Amino acid sequence: MTLTKLHKMKQAGEKIVCLTAYEASQAYWAVEAGVEVILVGDSLGMVVQGHQTTLPVTLNDMVYHTQMVQRKNHQAWCIADIPFMSDMNLSSVLDSAARLMKEGQANMVKLEGGQRVVEMVQALSDLGVPVCGHLGLLPQSVQKKGYQVAGKEAESAARLLGEAKMLESAGADMLVLECVPAQLAKQITQNLSIPVIGIGAGHETDGQVLVLHDVLGLTIGKAPKFSKNFLSEADSIQTALYQYVSDVKSGRFPASEHCVG
């Protein structure tokens, strides 16, 4: 998979299927099911390491898990998160991206935030590093803002749209929108030329992403409203992953009950 192909999929209206993976076997079976983008997310802090948030995840953790994923990912585009406090300044962002790309073999790095990270996105883009932005609910900011839908009021919606445009202008090649009203997600998607991947953002983004553990019903505690346990109606993990891919491609997922705003 290439960025060029992902952009062509957006232009053609073909849904992009993204899924998190944290180790080799997960990556292998995701690709076998037809997943086109693998996100090595700092969500591993919660679903793999058992933390309450993503904040304890280190850059070393991210490099380690990205390495494992890439050993068995021979087809999907791989995005790796730059973890909390590894984007304190331009120097730390460049160092973090270099490790994720060189040691982890990631194809792209992801940065959370809007205006705060525009300069960093520009610098990475100028150096030829593919960058994915992340707006809406920002897991790395939960200590301050909590888990809540973003962009429900007109002012915050306008700010998110403006920040999305700023990220694209700075050189972002892709954008994740998390927990924003479906109508706002549609508006942002239509206003950008780069692929927009949604999670809890309705069905009119260019693609969808879910955490693997939610797809397989492995969530500890209450599962997010925007998620679906595909294993409950399947006879194997492989079948569940195939069904997730099929439902995203056909538009069956997400359904109205998975919208959060």
Swiss-Prot record:
NCBIfam families: panB, PRK00311.1
Subunit relationships: Homodecamer; pentamer of dimers.
Cross-referenced CDD domains: KPHMT-like
Pfam family, one: Pantoate_transf
Keywords, sorted A to Z: Cytoplasm, Magnesium, Metal-binding, Pantothenate biosynthesis, Transferase
GO BP field: pantothenate biosynthetic process
Annotated transmembrane regions: none
InterPro entries to which the protein is assigned, alphabetical: Pantoate_hydroxy_MeTrfase (IPR003700), Pyrv/PenolPyrv_kinase-like_dom (IPR015813), Pyrv_kinase-like_dom_sf (IPR040442)
Descriptive protein name: 3-methyl-2-oxobutanoate hydroxymethyltransferase
EC number: 2.1.2.11
Localization: Cytoplasm
Key word Hydrolase present: no
Organism placement in taxonomy: Bacteria, Pseudomonadati, Pseudomonadota, Gammaproteobacteria, Thiotrichales
Function statement: Catalyzes the reversible reaction in which hydroxymethyl group from 5,10-methylenetetrahydrofolate is transferred onto alpha-ketoisovalerate to form ketopantoate.
